[in-house]
Regions:
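Basic/aromatic-rich interaction segments and small domains that mediate binding to polyanionic partners
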Residues: 2-67
């Protein structure tokens, strides 16, 4: 899953995000979602989330959904 739809992401989901500082390189950061920051149901560049470690970025790939 590509992380563009808000309804596919929930707190506790395991994801890869791209941090703002890594947007040019595309370097991805692995983590677990703590908060969903994007309010709209869809975002073409990925839903913005805060990971449990405090990092903020846009979801590029959902590894495991929290059920």
């Amino acid at each position: 899953m590509n992380g563009q739809n808000r309804n596919e992401i929930s707190p506790g989901a395991e994801v890869y995000i791209v941090l703002k500082k890594d947007q040019r390189s595309g370097k991805r950061t692995h983590g677990v979602v703590k908060d969903i920051l994007t309010n709209s149901p869809f975002h073409p560049h990925g839903i913005k989330v805060r990971l449990k470690n405090g990092q903020v970025g846009r979801v590029q790939e959902i590894i495991k959904k929290w059920l």
